């Protein structure tokens, strides 16, 4: 699982020129799943650690302006957007290959579970795009602060099943 996390003042998703989701201050999260991610991932320590890390990242300012507060403490929202292109392979030629991305059905199930699990941790503060849709994503970066989280890099010792 890969997450690109952006701290935003606001963000939104439109599909066919129709607003689907909007948030105020918080995190825009692009979420992608790899071919090694499967239906057992949500039951793993790795999955829970990624969910907790996402909402507990201390990237919001405290009273002194230092990045010292989490989303949970700050009170912001989350907008989750599926993004299979996070698994693009650019080593050959000029056209990206997506062979390392999870199959669409698997990715859809994992994405929907991610939305559910983040919402369980932050009830009523989570919005999402539409899986597989051509989306227009808008945002106003705050900082900017952009972080890339890859479960295989952050938790190499944790097996997908463990």
Swiss-Prot record:
Reaction(s) the record says it catalyses: glycyl-tRNA(Ala) + H2O = tRNA(Ala) + glycine + H(+); a D-aminoacyl-tRNA + H2O = a tRNA + a D-alpha-amino acid + H(+)
InterPro entries (alphabetical): Daa-tRNA_deacyls_DTD, DTD-like_sf
Cellular compartment(s): Cytoplasm
Keyword Hydrolase: yes
A single GO molecular function term of this UniProt record: D-tyrosyl-tRNA(Tyr) deacylase activity
Enzyme Commission no: 3.1.1.96
Motif position, Gly-cisPro motif, important for rejection of L-amino acids: 143-144
Keywords: Cytoplasm, Hydrolase, RNA-binding, tRNA-binding
Primary location class: cytoplasm
UniProt GO cellular component terms: cytoplasm
GO biological process: D-amino acid catabolic process
Keyword Cytoplasm set for record: yes
Domain remark in the UniProt entry: A Gly-cisPro motif from one monomer fits into the active site of the other monomer to allow specific chiral rejection of L-amino acids.
PANTHER family reported in the protein's UniProt record: D-AMINOACYL-TRNA DEACYLASE 1, D-TYROSYL-TRNA TYR DEACYLASE
Assembly and oligomerization: Homodimer.
Family membership: Belongs to the DTD family.
Function recorded in the entry: An aminoacyl-tRNA editing enzyme that deacylates mischarged D-aminoacyl-tRNAs. Also deacylates mischarged glycyl-tRNA(Ala), protecting cells against glycine mischarging by AlaRS. Acts via tRNA-based rather than protein-based catalysis; rejects L-amino acids rather than detecting D-amino acids in the active site. By recycling D-aminoacyl-tRNA to D-amino acids and free tRNA molecules, this enzyme counteracts the toxicity associated with the formation of D-aminoacyl-tRNA entities in vivo and helps enforce protein L-homochirality.
Annotated protein name in UniProt: D-aminoacyl-tRNA deacylase
Gene: dtd
């Amino acid at each position: 699982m890969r997450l690109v996390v952006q701290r935003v003042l606001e963000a939104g998703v439109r599909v066919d020129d129709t607003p689907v989701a909007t948030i105020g201050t918080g995190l825009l999260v692009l979420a992608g799943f790899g071919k090694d991610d499967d239906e057992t991932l949500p039951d793993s320590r790795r999955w829970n650690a990624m969910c907790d890390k996402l909402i507990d990242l201390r990237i919001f300012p405290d009273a002194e302006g230092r990045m010292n507060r989490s989303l949970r403490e700050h009170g912001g929202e989350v907008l989750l957007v599926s993004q299979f292109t996070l698994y693009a392979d650019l080593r050959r030629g000029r056209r990206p290959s997506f062979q390392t991305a999870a199959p669409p059905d698997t990715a859809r199930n994992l994405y929907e579970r991610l939305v559910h699990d983040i919402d369980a941790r932050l009830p009523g503060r989570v919005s999402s795009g539409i899986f597989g849709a051509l989306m227009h994503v808008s945002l106003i970066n705050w900082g900017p602060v952009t972080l890339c989280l890859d479960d295989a890099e952050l938790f190499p010792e944790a097996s997908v099943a463990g």
